[in-house]
Structures are given as C-alpha cells and as structure tokens.
Curated annotation (Swiss-Prot):
Name this protein carries in UniProt: 2-isopropylmalate synthase
Keywords, alphabetical: Amino-acid biosynthesis, Branched-chain amino acid biosynthesis, Cytoplasm, Leucine biosynthesis, Manganese, Metal-binding, Transferase
Stretches the record annotates as Disordered: 513-532
Highest taxon in the source lineage: Bacteria
Leader peptide range in chain numbering: none
InterPro entries: 2-IPM_HCS-like, 2-isopropylmalate_synth_dimer, AIPM/Hcit_synth_CS, Aldolase_TIM, LeuA/HCS_post-cat, LeuA_allosteric_dom_sf, LeuA_bact_synth, PYR_CT
Binding of Mn(2+), residues: D14, H202, H204, N238
Sequence similarity: Belongs to the alpha-IPM synthase/homocitrate synthase family. LeuA type 1 subfamily.
Gene3D superfamilies from the UniProt entry: 1.10.238.260, 3.30.160.270, Aldolase class I (3.20.20.70)
Length: 532
C-alpha cells in the first residue's frame, strides 16, 4: 500500500514575497478557497507578526477555511509565536511553523551565535508553540548547507521538544538532487527518534533543481513537500507543486506514494493564481503551460492521432484542462451561464451570479460570442467587486493622434458625488490617469503596466494589471474590457479603492491602539488609587 505525501502550499506566504504589490485580503481568500478546493493538506497563509495587514489576512483565512489545515510562519521569537497563535486560533485546525538558521554561515554571520545556542532556542520556542497547538512544524533554515552531523543534532532535539513535522529547506537552491536525497536518507539513518515526526522538504529553484530535489527527497523518504502554485516565489522561485503532484501521479510505479489532491482542479487553480498575482505562466511551463500538450512536429502529430500515449505521458483532462467552447451569446440566459460555470467546476458561492450575468450581457453585446476564459475572467472581476467601492468609473472620453496631444475627459462617482476633470498626457492612458489624479487629489504614480490578452482574435478581452505608488506604498490594480483604455482606467480606479481601503484600515488600527492605550492608562490609574 502506498504512503501519502502531504502537500504543503505556501503560495500565500513564500509565493507572495515575489509580487511587486501585496495582495488584498479578498484576493488571498479567493486563492485560499481555490487551494482548499484543490485539496491541499496544509496552506501556509502568511507571517502574522510582520504587519497588521498580514495578521488580518491570516485570521480571515483561518476563520473561513474548513477542509485544509491553516498555517502561519514565525521566527524562533516569542512574540512571533504568540501573535501567530492569536491569528490562527479561530481556525478549526491550525499549525504553527517556526524556523531558525542552522548552517555555519548563517549562525556565524546572521545570528552571531553558536550551534548549541541555536538548539537551545529552538527547543524553547517549539515548546512555547506547543502550548497553543499540538501541530508544530520546525524548519532548519539553510539545511542544504548545514553539515549532516549538525543537522542530525538539531532535528533530534526538535523532535524531542515536540515538533511533529521537521522541514528541511534548500533555502538558496544550492544542492543537487543526489545530495539532497542523501541528506534525507542520512536523517533516517542517524536520528534515533526520526519515526516520531514527518520529514518535509522546501526547495528553491535558483539552479532549476527545485522539483528534482523534491522528488529525490520523496524517493528517500520525505513525506511532505512544500511549494507554490506555478513555482512563484523569491528570486528564481519555489518548487512548483503542480509538477510534484503530477510527477507523483505519473510515476507511481517508481515512487509508490500518492497525494490527496483533486487533480481536476490543478489547471483552474494555476490560472487563478496567475491572474490574481499578475504573473503570467510561460508557454513552455511543465504541466500548466499553454504548450504543455501542444504538438507541432508532423511526426509527433501523426503519433498522437494514432495513440495519444505515443507522445503524452499525461492527458490535458487529468489536470482539468478542457477544450475551449463557443457556446454562449447575448441570447443565452442566466441558467445557461450558471450551467457553464458548473461545467467548469465552480460552485454557487464562488461567484456572484447577478454581477456575472450583468457583465456577461455587456460583453456578449460587444463580442457576439463569449468563451470559457472570458466567463472566468468576468467571474474573477465580479468577485473582486462584491464589496461596495467608493470610486466608480462613470464615463471617459479620449482624443489622441499622431499630431495632437492626448486629451482625456473622465467622470468618476466618488461615494455619493460625481466629479469630472480633463487633462492632457503622454498618450491616452496617461491622459486618463492625469485626469483621475485631478479628481481624487491623490498623486498616484505608475510603477508597472502590463497588458494581457484574455481570449483570441480582435474581440479578445484586454486585462490591464498595474502597480502604482502612493506615498511610498505600492498598490495593485486590475481592469478588464475589450477597450484597452477602458481597462486601464478600471485598473487605476481599482488602485484608488485599494488606497481608500488601506486608509480605512490604518484609521481603524489607530483607533484600536488609542482605545488600548486608554484602557492601559485607566488600569494604571486604578491600580495607583488602590495602592494609595
């Protein structure tokens, strides 16, 4: 009987570190729901002590996720662990993941400590975390460059302290597969209490070996793999979970292990992460790339037509990739749209049908036919806009040409008021943005602008993803329309609403801090009076 490999997803923690702008709580929650639907066993959703925003997102996800274990990351620091426990305690099941560096280089130059002191600190912090939950994971940061005897000492002590999962990271993507497999095998050989914990691995792709190292570790006995969807992450990225999952499924004959992943959800989840994180998937990306199941060579095409297994070791259907269909028009009713969403695997609570159908009719009037990917894009945008927004784009008009300066007129709905302005700019998009800045009074500067075609042909939707700077902080915005200038305007309006929301959060945090300070002062005065 094959053993299970636990899939530990860190897209919302390690993966998010690669993004130019942080995701909103709503965006993180949408990804978390998709990961839960895909069947990940554990999802690491943030670093709660790092910021009030991260604390809020971890707590929100912990409150809403029911079928996956929610995890928060901490350093081996008391405050980190206490704050993580506070954020996670609303979850039905949660894990605290704490780490400390173990390589000689990190201990000497970063921690300015000794191995004995590191072990002592790890033991204390693991026990502290165990006060909050039985599910504690401990990571030996830079384990790939830690001498095996030292690593064995740390792992044995961590297990004795109560860690149920021991994670072995190749933090800088340095090791080769045979080396990394040997590290895992050595732990099984030399750590006497190794049977009391699950051995996990966390690999990075600096040398393009993250998946290879993870598979070598699984072959050597590791039973948890950490990674991200599409391999997103710092520097060259993390281990691509979709590749690990399909490698385990495809090469069961060699590995004799399995996962509890719903493989039919892989492609959809991958696309969702790509869209929300504004990180396009390379066409030649294994498993989920546009060319992963494409055959252009005549010999290959002939072989596939005769028997797909000649050149396909897995099928598009095995990851939930279905053929694009041309079956929805402006004459299609709500029931048809709902049925198509069900066929694509969406549940009723994944999207707002009223908003989706309204947006669908507008698009269908423009395009005539609406594709599956159009429908998903509209559902995604509708999901983002479910909460009332302060700013709405009411109207815009642009005049531009090769011999005239671009001029834009924009009308925004700002709460209960409507305001209009006109401005010139370096092109139609810049003119629109200058007019919007005049209306709001925000001096928002564009940092990154990316246009992606969603669909095919002249009627394709244009998705504009932007990163904008406001008072030293970066905000992400997305817009979707058949008109590029319109989608650009929508993206900036999305940024404005994110800025407005961030300001409201800051005010609420200040109010809570003032309230807490007042309570502390009142308590001190009361204690002083009692003493007198």
């Amino acid at each position: 009987m094959s053993e299970q490999v636990i899939i530990f997803d860190t897209t919302l923690r390690d993966g998010e570190q690669a993004l130019q702008a942080s995701l909103s709580v709503k965006e993180k929650l949408q990804i978390a729901f998709a990961l839960e639907r895909m069947g990940v066993d554990v999802m690491e959703v943030g670093f709660p002590v790092s910021s009030p925003g991260d604390f809020e997102s971890v707590q929100t996800i912990a409150r809403n996720i029911k079928n996956s274990r929610v995890c928060g990351l901490t350093r081996c620091v008391e405050k980190d662990i206490d704050v993580a426990a506070e954020a996670l305690r609303v979850a039905e099941a949660f894990r605290i993941h704490t780490f400390i560096a173990t390589s000689p280089m990190h201990i000497a130059t970063k921690l300015r400590s000794t191995l004995d002191e590191v072990i002592e600190r790890a033991i204390y912090m693991i026990k502290r975390a165990r006060n909050y939950t039985d599910d504690v994971e401990f990571s030996c940061e830079d384990a790939g460059r830690t001498p095996i005897p030292d690593l064995c000492r740390v792992v044995e002590a961590a297990i004795n302290a109560g860690a149920r999962t021991i994670n072995i990271p190749d933090t800088v993507g340095y090791t080769m597969p045979h080396e990394f497999g040997n590290i895992i095998a050595s732990l099984y050989q030399h750590v006497p209490n190794i049977d009391k914990a699950i051995i996990s691995v966390h690999t990075h792709d600096d040398l393009g070996l993250a998946v290879g190292n993870a598979m070598a570790a699984v072959h050597a006995g590791a039973r948890q793999v950490e990674g991200t969807l599409n391999g997103i992450g710092e520097r060259a990225g993390n281990c691509s979970l979709e590749e690990v999952i399909m490698a385990i499924k495809t090469r069961h004959d060699i590995l004799n292990v399995h996962t509890n992943i719903n493989h039919q959800e892989i492609y959809r989840t991958s696309q969702l992460v790509s869209q929300i994180c504004n990180m396009p998937i390379p066409a030649n990306k294994a498993v989920v790339g546009a060319n992963a199941f494409a055959h252009s060579s005549g010999i290959h095409q002939d072989g596939v037509l005769k028997n797909r297994e000649n050149y396909e070791i897995m099928t598009p259907e095995s990851i939930g990739l279905k053929e694009v269909q041309l079956n929805l028009t402006s004459r299609s009713g709500r029931a048809a749209v709902k049925h198509r969403m069900e066929e694509m695997g969406y549940q009723d609570n994944d999207y707002n049908l009223d908003d989706l159908y309204s947006a669908f009719l507008k698009l269908a009037d423009k395009k005539g036919q609406v594709f599956d990917y159009d429908l998903e894009a509209l559902a995604f945008i509708s999901r983002q806009q479910e909460e009332p927004e302060f700013y709405h784009l009411d109207y815009f008009s642009v005049q531009s040409g090769s011999s005239v300066m671009a001029t834009a007129s924009v009308k925004l709905i700002c709460g209960e008021e409507t305001q209009s302005e006109a401005a010139t700019g370096n092109g139609p998009v810049d003119a629109v943005y200058q007019a919007i800045n005049r209306i709001t009074g925000y001096q928002v500067s564009l940092v990154k602008y990316q246009l992606t075609a969603k669909g095919q042909g002249r009627d394709a939707l244009g998705q504009v993803d932007i990163v904008a700077d406001y008072q030293g902080r970066r905000f992400h915005g997305v817009g979707l329309a058949t008109d590029i200038v319109e989608s650009s305007a929508q993206a900036m309006v999305n940024v404005l609403n994110n800025i407005k929301r961030a300001q409201q959060v800051e005010k609420e945090i200040q109010r809570l801090q003032q309230h807490n300070n007042q309570q502390q002062n009142d308590s001190k005065q009361q204690n002083s009076q009692e003493t007198v």
